[in-house]
Amino acid sequence: MWELIKANQRKSLILFITLGIVLIVLGFILGSAYSPDGGGFVGVFFALIIWGILSLISYFTGSKILLAVSSAKEVTKDVHPQLFNIVEEMKIASGYQFMPKVYIINSAAPNAFATGVRQNNTAVAVTAGLLARLNRDELQGVVAHEMSHIVNRDVLFMTFAGIMLGSIVLISQVFLRSLWFGGGGRYRSKSSKDSGQAQLIFMVIAIAFAILAPIMAQLLYFAISRKREYLADATAVRLTRYPEGLASALEKISDSTEELKTANKVTAPMYIANPLKSQGRKLSDLTSTHPPISERIRILRNIAQGANFINYQSAFEKIKGKKENLIPPSALTDSSSIGLKESVDLPLTAISKKKIQREAGDIMMKVNHYSFINCSCGLKIKIPPDFKKEEIFCPRCGRRHSIVK
């Protein structure tokens, strides 16, 4: 697995440098459009300043912002022991040094993501809807996928690559809007004095590059994002030795009709499945943040003989119908056999699903500081945190209960 991580880091560096070159060239061209004599270097300086500020904000507070925007709340082990145990199992299986924090998102839409640019401050967040639908094997598959993103340093890379992309888009938009809102007159009057022709050429090039640079950067970013989803699936199979768990989880996520209202275009690439489903169907493969979920499921269900990377690579090529180097050759040299395990977890029935849905609702109430009283009649009384009285009557049997503050 370490070969895959190293290869991932090399490719990440190449992409990061490529996006950096696009950012620098964009800054130089736009700066030259303002002033052909030395303006290009000023443009590069300001482009790097913008990127640096956004990077610092992301490094120190990015995870907090993402979790807050997603309405995710941190939970302790007593709130959901099974989820904590699974995260801990996958942390041990992956050989990761630090235990990620665990968050639950208050949404009925099943989904999950991982975040954290610093190795000692990572987090795995799952929705209440995911907990309501999945059995243990399926939940383990999802957590293993997210743990793979952390171990492979995808979270770090996608965060800073996303900032680079955001800087390119921001600078381009500011430049184009400045032209739209009356900037053109200033350029014309200036160009009529001395280097009119040179500035006009730079202006045409700048407009074209300001339009094309964000598109090129996004296509590159999305292509790498899609590939990393495949690699996280492959690593999850290696960690769990049970591809059907993740395949079944992805199937249930895909079948869900609930909308994840807290997701947006910025946070969408972080999730295990595209949360913007209604928009995602209209997009081509080039502009999608995730590979087709049906294809991911077919690959997982075609894995045979073992849970090694080479087994995933074989299934990947079979479904794609062509040879394609998804996993670096250095990671395929491991000849040790990792056998697939058989599931001992039963599928959810209609009754058990209802029970889990109620439990997921109770979890979110517990996270939001509700307290619970189990009445002898079998009713669980849920008391909101702002309830002021010292006693409460059971709405079913009328029994009086004291409230311990």
Give the residues covered by each predicted segment.
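Zn2+-dependent metallopeptidase catalytic core
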Residues: 77-98
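Cytosolic-facing loops and C-terminal tails of multi-pass membrane proteins
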Residues: 197, 201-223, 239-405
